[in-house]
Design a protein with these regions (language model features):
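Alpha-helical membrane insertion/targeting regions
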Residues: 1-183
Length: 183
């Protein structure tokens, strides 16, 4: 049973959970709209460089996440914080670039067939499904770290780290598979 102080603190977190929910739902809704409903502007040359830039941001996020976890295991808190902020910034830049690209281009279909298409679709499906909780979990991890609620922060990050890392790495793999299929 929670102590009165813990219960009061939990109620104090309520505005964060509301904002986190709104931000998460809005970002997922925008992404779903761009990928599933909007057709794109039709100009295939505009922002054609963005998939490579986005893959670079994803790759950077993956490296920064691994370095950040190594830093905290070595009790290098300041380094961990800087690396996590950099990973968050890199993932944020990825998301902005991804949204901009798909706003212009709409959805990108994999042109291959056979086993490669099946492998691509399986990888893409796992990437998409696991990317859904990254934004709200990331916001929660940062929130509880800034509030110095490290027990809660650690519980969230034990789940978040492997998911965020997987999504970052598979984002690069999806790009490479599309790039090789389109030549």
């Amino acid at each position: 049973m929670a102590t009165p102080t813990a219960a009061a603190e939990d109620r104090g977190d309520r505005p964060f959970w509301i904002v986190n929910g709104v931000v998460s739902v809005l970002s997922l809704s925008l992404l779903a709209y761009l990928l599933l409903l909007r057709q794109g502007a039709g100009d295939k040359t505009s922002l054609a460089f963005m998939p490579a830039v986005n893959a670079t941001f994803n790759g950077a996020s993956a490296v920064l996440l691994v370095l950040a976890v190594a830093a905290i295991k070595e009790k290098k808190v300041a380094r961990h914080q800087k690396l996590m902020l950099a990973a968050f910034a890199s993932s944020t830049f990825f998301l902005v670039g991804y949204l901009a690209y798909h706003y212009v281009h709409g959805d990108t279909r994999y042109p291959g067939t056979g086993g490669m298409r099946i492998a691509y679709l399986a990888l893409l499906a796992s990437h998409v499904v696991l990317s859904i909780p990254v934004v709200p979990m990331c916001l929660a991890a940062f929130y509880f770290a800034f509030r110095r609620k490290f027990v809660t922060h650690k519980k969230i990050t034990k789940l978040l780290f492997p998911i965020w890392l997987y999504v970052s790495v598979t984002g690069v793999l999806v790009f490479l598979m599309l790039r090789s299929a389109y030549g």
